[in-house]
From Swiss-Prot:
DNA-dependent RNA polymerase catalyzes the transcription of DNA into RNA using the four ribonucleoside triphosphates as substrates. HAMAP family: RNApol_bact_RpoB. One of its GO terms (molecular function) is DNA binding. This is DNA-directed RNA polymerase subunit beta. It comes from Aliarcobacter butzleri (strain RM4018). One of its GO terms (biological process) is DNA-templated transcription.
Length: 1382
């Protein structure tokens, strides 16, 4: 059982009712495994890697004359040049080199026949193809220094799909279609038209009758008829048309009188033929019955009928019979003939109609092409539809049709597509055949005919059995394939153009890898699925990597996606989260995987279930895809079960094929693994989610991803138990790889010593500080263990941002009151207490990067310097000698961060300038100050500076100093690691010797140890490393060998460490890679502390968002009877209409947690002698409220030190976990309220902070988890005085980024019109907008203290006149004409 009080590095009371049997799978495993199977780095056998399959699908490449062959032998991947951190800082791509081994074979050809007769020459070569971006251990990619994520794509699975759609032409008529969708190649659509003719389209081109396709595939008319119609043999006897009596032909009411061959009535029209009657008729000798003439008149012949005398064709196959034709058959004495029975059950006349439709077009083609064979004509017809206007021969047309669907190079269904085809059509084609077969095409049309007659099943395209996931490995393989196809074409073209001797030809002369480079670069930089990683907090990062997008190449287009695709489908249950999706135009197109779901090898999402046998739940857990779960009866996770696993209630609510039904317990096949399995990670973090409206839950889960990491994060008092899972799988936290004892821990390193099957070891972990993330939040890790602590494998040893004791912590537990307060919380506004600001509760640190480049220009190079023209000394006092700001400087808007000068263009100097140059040297006057200045609305401390210099240019003092300090840090780290290796070596040797006995006497520190004794550990610890060899010689040969092996191993480890260190030092010495034209680049990192202020956006976890409207002094806030002031006041009207009642329950449980925490704090403060026993009793009492927890046994198993440590955490508030759909019940709430001494309605008496009077009503007060979102007022508000103007209209530009103004729009104009404020309105539309002359005059008048003159003509008016002139209209402005005349 996985349920435990432990959650991360703390205790949490979990109220789950059903024991958890399965660990939540790693949240990032989909991305990781997909990329690993694509590249298979570090594995000996890489033949099954995705990348190998791609290359093998392209090679070998032959030229047209068969002179050359290029074969692929295998690929190799190298090591990355820079590590992840370096790549990000330097703005490079974290990648590995890919090489392929290629063999070029030159063939000896027979001069006469041109056939190969032997090998002339063979050359092998290893070619560098390109750098492939490498996935980091946190499943992201670093592209050009920016961290990106490749989102998984949810697309239509290849295979066959049948649909019904409403006809565009005929009213209420349904049109049936069948589509064969490949992964690569031409789509095949089969569709009925309104006249019931069956057509086929290839790639949405013009439709042709389906029989044209069959004929192009080589089927004759008779073959096609036999495939689609039952053949009925009509016998002619006594001028009557007879057929064999078959009872199956008479289902339902009979439409005509059934007569025997003698003309006697057997069954009258309108009656039914029962099985008993049929049997009696057959036994009575009924063999032949009359075929009604009126039915025979409209039937068609099943094969060609020849004249018995002349042997000429009398009637073609599919000739429609009529009175004359039947008479002819009688006259010529035919005994029998065959007809196609299109009246049989599950059959229609669509194929016959298609033959009729194609007859006309083939007749015309016959005349133009002068070819008689109809099959050849059909192939030409398809060629002409696909490539209109091109001349064609019959051989080329046949070859074209064949290649379209049956050539593996052009057409690929993939293994998935083949599996879906076999499943749907009931064919048994081997799964390695990934092209179409003739059988596939025939069976698809046969099934479509069945669907039309109501005997087949229509597919649901939104069913998860028809949609699959393409993860990074497959997406990358597709991109690589696209690039290789281009390369293959280029190689073939090159081979064709080669002439003369080919002896000197090498593989690299043919292969040009530019095509691959461009496709992969494009995919990672501008592809729709490669996205800038959302790194606001660990949750946003984890959910971004679990995202499923229906958009992207080969996916949907959001403008055309309808409601059905976006909607929640029953098969999403346990596979895709029904809650977490963006609001707006992408709603439902971007989804997230559910918590427990996995993706199988074929790309289908699977959900886990426990098997149920005869109403008893077993412990067997299996994963099912949406297709596998069809027809099974599934019980929900909250079903009540007794201790033996038997379902208690005889009738339970179950799911079957997406329907909710009531069924008996014995008919249940499966049961949900957990009540959490329905939702995704973010939604599962919302406690009491089941009490929230879905719209608000959606907002809640989306807003948790926007919460900025706080300076002092605190895990929620009311959690769901999933907080530790997010922390476990987010890379931000450092987890122990192996269990052991913390040997050393400082601000930057943790060393853990332990033992495994190979003996003692010491693991090293690096702790990051003040790193800038993609979203400008600060990334810092805090050590969560101390020296001497014992840690388990996977335990969090350092918390990342937004983490607290190994749990996700995106906000703060604040005391909340639901009440109006002087109108300040109108419309969801939030009132805060000043206490939160004093205690830095909602303070966050943001790091911004500013960069400046020095370029090579025509008239000299730009330069970074302190020597700036026209700048006072005090303005640059914070810069160092190189002109770069010093680390630790507090900068404010307008301060110079990096001094830079740019040479002016060469202008002939005036005599004065020449004199100045003569006096002051070259510099004076011909450079402009182009320094990097701290932008408006940004102030903070400079935390880091990076300087990069191009090869061949001298590094300045600052760059040299940076390198020296980094070197010193690397040396220190290296020294530490060496010390730890020495320590590990001694531990392993001591380990070895403690288990062995001496084979001869040895003297140590004047003490003689006899043969057969063991030297004590404290003595061994004091033995000098160099004297150890002598001691070891007193042991057996095996021990001596083992000792030498240990020494050898550590010598290698130290050498490896030294190499690693040297490499890092070399990278430091390396010249930096900068883009062309750039000679130097400086990056300055500024850290800003943002306290919460009025205008910031805050939210709870239930979609209850609002803006801070007022920050009130602590003394003015309402307070409780014990004097505790409230932290946050929310509007009670925000709850009923939004229907997110979960927040009220959270507040109640939070209050209980805090009150119980206070009781534990009281025990600490009382300092009684037996306080540990008291703590144990109190904590056991609280933990025992949850049934599954077995609180007493757990508390008793803790030693005193551990108990006190956990109690100190609980003193700040007892932590609860209430799982979604399986949380706290009413009786548990009552028990907790009783323990915490809270009134049963959860309300408190409040006093007004200003007057001290008791409030009239009791108020709902408690603790809610509040988040501060990244919509910060400091980054939104700006004010423009004068600034840039738009070029054409001359109006001020818009937006903060461009320092723009606020548009005075149409509605604002109406407002001024309504008030009759004429002059204000005129000023708004002219002087303040686009009257160019007027605004200059107004500025001058204001500057000189004069009256503002009248406004002129707005620029927009001139633009309008110019546009009218462009339409050849002579437009002149009335005033101007008069002026010209005067």
């Amino acid at each position: 059982m996985l349920n435990s009080l432990k959650s991360g590095n703390r205790l949490r009371v979990d109220f789950a009712k059903n024991p958890q049997k399965i660990e939540i799978p790693n949240l990032l495993q989909l991305q990781q495994t997909s990329y690993d199977t694509f590249l298979m780095i570090g594995q000996e056998d890489r033949t099954t890697a995705g990348i190998e399959k791609v290359f093998k699908s392209i090679f070998p490449i032959h030229d047209v004359q068969n002179r050359l062959t290029l074969d692929y032998l295998g690929s190799e991947v190298g090591k990355p040049k820079y590590d992840v951190r370096e790549s990000m800082v330097r703005g490079l791509t974290y990648s590995i080199p890919l090489k392929i081994n290629i063999r070029l074979t030159l063939w000896d050809l027979d001069e006469k026949t041109g056939e190969k007769i032997g090998v002339k020459d063979m050359k092998e070569q290893s070619l560098f193809i390109r750098e492939i971006p490498l996935m980091t251990d946190r499943t992201s990619f670093i592209v050009n220094g920016v961290e990106r994520v490749v989102v998984n794509q949810l697309h239509r699975s290849p295979g066959v799909i049948f649909k019904e759609e409403e006809s565009n032409t005929a009213d209420n008529k349904l049109i049936y279609t069948g589509q064969i969708i490949p992964d690569r190649g031409s789509w095949l659509y089969f569709e009925y038209d309104s006249k019931d003719v069956l057509y086929v389209r290839i790639n949405k081109r013009r439709k042709v009758p389906v029989t044209i396709l069959f004929r192009a595939l080589g089927y004759s008319k008779e073959d096609i008829i036999k495939l689609f119609y039952p053949i009925v043999n009509i016998k002619i006897k006594n001028n009557k048309f007879l057929t064999e009596f078959n009872p199956d032909d008479f289902m339902g009411r009979i439409e005509f009188d059934v007569k025997d061959d003698k003309g006697n009535l057997v069954i009258g029209a309108g009656k039914r033929l029962t099985a008993r009657k049929a049997k009696a008729l057959i036994e009575g000798g009924l063999k032949l019955i009359e075929y009604p003439l009126e039915l025979l008149m409209d039937r068609s012949t099943a094969n060609t009928i020849y004249d018995p005398e002349s042997g000429e064709v009398l009637f073609d196959a599919l000739t429609n019979l009529d009175e004359l034709k039947l008479k002819k058959l009688l006259d010529l004495g035919f005994e029998s003939f065959d007809i196609a029975n299109d009246l049989a059950v599950g059959i229609d006349a669509s194929i016959i109609n298609a033959f009729k439709a194609d007859a006309e077009s083939l007749k015309l083609l016959k005349q133009t092409e002068q070819i008689d064979d109809e099959n050849d004509l059909a192939a030409i017809r398809i060629y002409k539809v696909m490539r209109p206007g091109e001349p064609v021969t019959k051989e080329a047309a046949k070859d074209f049709v064949k290649k379209l669907f049956f050539d593996p190079e052009r057409y690929d269904l993939t293994k998935v597509g083949r599996m879906k085809m076999n499943h749907k059509l009931g064919v048994n084609v081997p799964e390695y055949v990934t092209t179409l077969t003739y059988e596939d095409v025939i069976k698809t049309v046969q099934y479509l005919v069945k669907v039309k007659s109501g005997h087949g099943h229509i597919d649901d395209r939104d069913h998860l059995g028809n949609r699959r996931i393409r993860a990074i490995g497959e997406l990358l393989a597709n991109e690589l394939h696209a690039g290789l196809i281009k390369m293959q074409k280029a190689i073939r073209d090159k081979m064709t153009t080669l002439s003369g001797t080919l002896e000197d030809l090498m593989p690299h002369d043919l292969v040009n890898s530019k095509m691959i480079t461009s496709t992969i670069t494009e995919f990672f930089t501008s592809g729709q699925l490669s996205q800038f990683m959302d790194q606001t907090n660990p949750l946003s990062e984890v959910t971004h990597k679990r995202r499923l997008s229906a958009l992207g190449e080969g996916g949907l287009v959001k403008e055309r996606a309808g409601f059905e695709v976006r909607d929640v489908h029953p098969t999403h249950y346990g596979r895709i989260c029904p809650v977490e999706t963006p609001e707006g135009q992408n709603i439902g197109l971007i989804n997230t995987l559910s918590t427990f779901s996995k993706v199988n090898d074929l790309g289908f999402i699977e959900a886990p279930y426990k098997k149920v046998v005869d109403g008893v739940v077993t412990n067997e857990i299996s994963y099912y895809t949406a297709t596998q779960e069809e027809g099974l009866v599934i019980a929900p996770g909250s079903t009540k079960v007794d201790e033996n696993g038997k379902i208690i209630e005889p009738l339970i609510e179950v799911r079957k094929n997406g329907e909710i039904l009531l069924m008996e317990r014995n008919s249940v096949d499966l049961i949900d693994i957990s009540s959490q399995m329905v939702m995704g990670v973010a939604a599962s973090l919302i406690p009491f989610l089941e009490h929230d409206d879905a719209n608000r839950a959606l907002m809640g889960s989306n807003m948790m991803r926007q919460a900025v990491p706080l300076l002092r994060p605190s895990a929620p008092v009311v959690g769901t138990g999933l907080e530790k899972i997010v922390a476990r799988d987010a890379w931000e936290a450092i987890k122990a790889n192996r269990a052991g004892l913390v040997e050393k821990a400082d601000a930057k390193n943790i060393y853990i010593r332990g033992e495994d099957e190979n003996g003692a070891f010491i693991d090293h972990y690096t702790v990051n500080k003040n790193v800038r993330t993609n979203n400008n939040t600060s990334f810092g890790q805090r050590i969560a263990v101390k020296e001497g602590d014992f840690v388990q494998k996977g335990q969090v040893i350092a918390d990342g941002p937004s983490m607290d004791k190994g749990e996700l912590a995106v906000g703060i537990n604040a005391m909340v009151a639901f009440m109006p307060w002087n109108g300040y919380n109108y419309e969801d506004a939030i009132i805060l207490s000043e206490r939160l600001i004093e205690e830095d509760a909602f303070t966050s640190v943001h790091i911004y990067e500013k960069e400046i480049e020095c370029r090579e220009l025509k008239h000299g190079n730009e330069e970074i310097t302190r020597d700036l023209p026209g700048v006072k000394e005090e303005s640059i006092s914070h810069l160092d000698n190189s002109g770069i700001v010093k680390v630790g400087t507090y900068v404010t808007p307008g301060m110079i961060l990096v001094g830079k000068v740019t040479p002016k263009g060469e202008i002939k100097p005036t005599p004065e300038e020449r004199l100045l140059r003569a006096i002051f040297g070259e510099k004076a006057g011909h450079v402009i100050n182009k320094s990097l200045v701290c932008p408006t609305s940004m102030e903070g401390t400079v935390v880091d500076v990076k300087v990069f210099t191009k090869k061949g240019y001298e590094k300045d003092d600052r760059a040299v100093a940076e390198i020296e300090s980094e070197k010193a840090e690397l040396d220190l780290k290296h020294h530490d690691k060496l010390l730890m290796l020495d320590r590990e070596e001694i531990l392993k040797i001591n380990d070895l010797l403690l288990k062995a006995t001496l084979t001869k006497d040895v003297e140590l520190d004047d003490v003689v140890y006899k043969k057969g004794e063991t030297i004590p550990v404290d003595v061994l610890n004091n033995v000098n490393r160099f004297a150890m060899k002598k001691v070891v010689s007193s042991y057996s040969k095996e021990i001596e060998k083992a000792y030498n092996d240990i020494k050898e191993y550590f010598i290698k480890q130290k050498a490896h460490l030294r190499e690693e260190h040297e490499e890092k030092l070399q990278i430091l010495e390396h010249d930096d890679i900068l883009s062309s034209g750039v000679i130097k680049q400086v990056k300055v990192y500024i850290a800003t502390k943002r306290k919460i202020k009025v205008g910031d956006k805050m939210a709870g976890r239930h979609g209850n968002k609002g803006i801070v409207s007022n920050i009130v002094p602590k003394v003015d806030m309402p307070y409780l009877e014990d004097g505790t002031t409230v932290d946050v006041i929310l509007n009670p009207l925000g709850v009923p209409s939004r229907m997110n009642i979960g927040q009220i329950l959270e507040v109640h449980l939070g209050l209980a947690g805090k009150k119980l925490g206070n009781q534990i704090q009281d025990i600490f403060e009382a300092k009684r002698a037996d306080f540990i026993a008291e703590l144990r009793a109190k904590m056991t009492e609280i933990a025992s409220v949850a049934k599954l927890m077995n609180g007493k046994a757990f508390m008793d198993s803790l030693n005193d030190e551990e108990l006190v440590q956990y109690a100190q955490d609980w003193a700040k508030g007892v932590r609860f976990a209430t799982q979604i759909f399986d949380g706290v019940k009413a009786e548990e709430f009552a028990k907790l309220f009783e323990l915490a001494k809270i009134d049963s309605d959860g309300k408190c008496v409040l006093f007004d902070g200003k007057t001290g009077e008791k409030m009239k009503e009791r108020v709902n007060v408690g603790y809610m988890y509040m988040l501060k979102l990244h919509h910060l007022v400091d980054e939104k508000v700006h004010a423009r005085s004068t600034g840039p103007y738009s070029l054409v209209t001359q109006q001020p530009v818009g937006g903060k980024a461009l320092f723009g103004g606020q548009r005075f729009g149409e509605m604002e104009v109406w407002a001024l019109e309504a008030y009759g404020a004429t002059n204000v309105l005129k000023e708004m539309l002219t002087t303040k907008s686009d009257d160019v002359e007027g605004r200059t005059k107004a500025y001058r008048a204001i500057a000189n203290g004069e009256n503002v003159p009248n406004s002129g003509v707005p620029e927009t008016f001139f633009v309008l006149t110019k546009e009218l002139k462009a339409l050849a209209l002579d437009v002149e402005i009335f005033g101007e004409v008069e002026n010209n005349e005067q």
